[in-house]
A protein has these predicted regions:
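Hydrophobic transmembrane alpha-helices and their helix-loop junctions in integral membrane proteins
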Residues: 2-196
Length: 196
């Protein structure tokens, strides 16, 4: 993942929104029969839940614009894999599609912002973008609201279904708390992009 962060922003958009995430999800969808109903399913559930937690925590303390977006990709990958580990391949695919759409838009807009401010990626340096690039700022906000479960955007429906399935399936309280943390922690680091 660190090589994809250093790459030019269109390459990062391609790798993080489709290639990297889709390859892992596709492999688990194809091999999900191997771990359904076994002890390996609980191990994968724990592994993916810890991935969600650590990537979300790392993104909260980062100031590099592309690293924040990349760590949120890793966290979303954990959410998708967690959905697959409890047996909902169609929901995982739907969440993958909504994630890819908003993540690609966010990376392309981040590339436009970085280009506009002379290759600075530190969000503490970026400021008053609304007056400089209003259309790009609008697209960034649209992508952020898609990730933050704003009503009537695809992220709202996919993340709401994730929470509903986690609640209905009566999974362990620890895993349910981690899912709620992940779905709501995206608010913090996306608001940090908006704030700075």
């Amino acid at each position: 993942m660190s090589a994809a962060i250093v790459a030019p922003t269109p390459v990062s958009a391609l790798v993080h929104s489709s290639t990297l995430v889709t390859a892992g999800v596709y492999l688990l969808v194809r091999f999900r029969v191997a771990f359904e109903g076994s002890d390996m399913q609980i191990t994968l559930l724990l592994l993916f839940s810890l991935t969600i937690f650590m990537a979300g925590l790392g993104a909260n303390f980062e100031y590099d614009l592309k690293k924040i977006i990349a760590l949120s990709t890793l966290s979303q990958l954990g959410v998708i894999m967690r959905i697959l580990s409890i047996g909902y391949a169609n929901l995982g695919f739907f969440h993958l599609l909504s994630h890819a759409l908003f993540k690609a838009l966010l990376f392309i807009c981040a590339g436009a912002v970085i280009h506009n401010i002379k290759d600075y990626q530190d969000i503490r340096v970026i400021g008053s973008l609304v007056s400089q690039i209003p259309l790009t700022t609008f697209c960034i906000n649209l992508a952020k609201f898609g990730f933050m479960r704003e009503s009537f955007l695809a992220g709202f429906y996919s993340k709401d279904l994730v929470l509903e399935i986690a609640f209905i399936r009566n999974i362990f309280l620890f895993f349910f708390i981690l899912v709620c943390y992940r779905v709501n922690s995206v608010l913090y680091f996306l608001f940090s992009i908006l704030y700075f």
